[in-house]
């Protein structure tokens, strides 16, 4: 996807469904909260490729979308909570549409038209989400799985246990989910900006600025140390390098 389109914050074309996807601002995400946002992202981005080969056997005849629908159609409390998180995220992505869950698809309705998320276009939808929300950057402790349905629950529990071990090794297992608020706080102080100005950023814009700021800080510290006569310093990356490979 074009980096300028992502960085501009404009809506993103989703031609496979004949609709555009809104890039929500952080102030919009704040309405649903970071936990619901990351939970929704986690499940909308679910892929069998995350699993080990032995865990894929029972799912070989199901698409990623069919697995997702088995979760949102589950009536257990955990399934309902997950469905609510997905619903809230979808309302941010498609603000002009009413969201309806059916057994075979997710329908987006307004007075003029309706479009459908289904197994035919869901893979392309996931690709857009991954780039728009930089989902390949997420850390182990950013969100929890709340599965519904026996098969989906089995998948999610395996993933959750693996992540819990990684988080426990870092002493982060019980940390709250506050990724965006932390990044905003750091940038507001580090760049001497009004904290409210970041609320109009998209997720992509926030990550872009934070990564660039971090590279610039490292570069400045390195140059200051060199000028002060420090020896045997480890080289740092050029702060102007491409950060979206």
Model-derived features: where do they sit?
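Long, intrinsically disordered, low-complexity Ser/Thr/Pro-rich regulatory/activation regions
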Residues: 226-245
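Short coil/turn linker and secondary-structure boundary residues
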Residues: 80, 99, 120, 178, ...
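An amphipathic, hydrophobic-aromatic interaction surface with interspersed Lys/Arg
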Residues: 1-66, 74, 130-222
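Long amphipathic alpha-helical segments with strong coiled-coil/leucine-zipper propensity
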Residues: 81-163
């Amino acid at each position: 996807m074009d980096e300028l389109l992502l960085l501009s914050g404009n809506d993103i074309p989703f031609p496979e469904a004949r609709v555009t996807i809104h890039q929500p601002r952080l102030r919009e995400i704040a309405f649903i909260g970071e936990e619901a946002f990351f939970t929704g992202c986690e499940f909308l981005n679910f892929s069998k490729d995350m699993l080990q080969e032995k865990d894929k056997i029972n799912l070989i005849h199901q698409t990623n979308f069919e697995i997702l629908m088995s979760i949102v159609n589950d009536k257990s409390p955990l399934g309902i909570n997950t469905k609510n998180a997905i619903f809230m995220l979808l309302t941010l992505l498609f603000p002009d549409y009413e969201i309806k869950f059916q057994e075979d698809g997710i329908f987006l309705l307004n007075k003029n038209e309706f479009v459908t998320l289904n197994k035919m276009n869901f893979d392309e939808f996931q690709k857009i989400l991954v780039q728009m929300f930089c989902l390949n950057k997420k850390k182990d402790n950013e969100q929890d799985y709340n599965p519904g349905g026996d098969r989906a629950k089995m998948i999610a529990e395996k993933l959750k246990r693996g992540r819990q071990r990684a988080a426990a090794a870092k002493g982060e297992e019980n940390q709250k989910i506050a990724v965006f608020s932390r990044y905003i706080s750091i940038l507001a102080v580090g760049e001497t900006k009004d904290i409210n100005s970041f609320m109009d950023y998209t997720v992509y814009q926030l990550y872009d600025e934070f990564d660039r700021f971090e590279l610039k800080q490292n570069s400045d510290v390195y140059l200051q140390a060199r000028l002060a006569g420090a020896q045997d310093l480890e080289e740092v990356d050029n702060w102007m390098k491409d950060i979206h490979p």
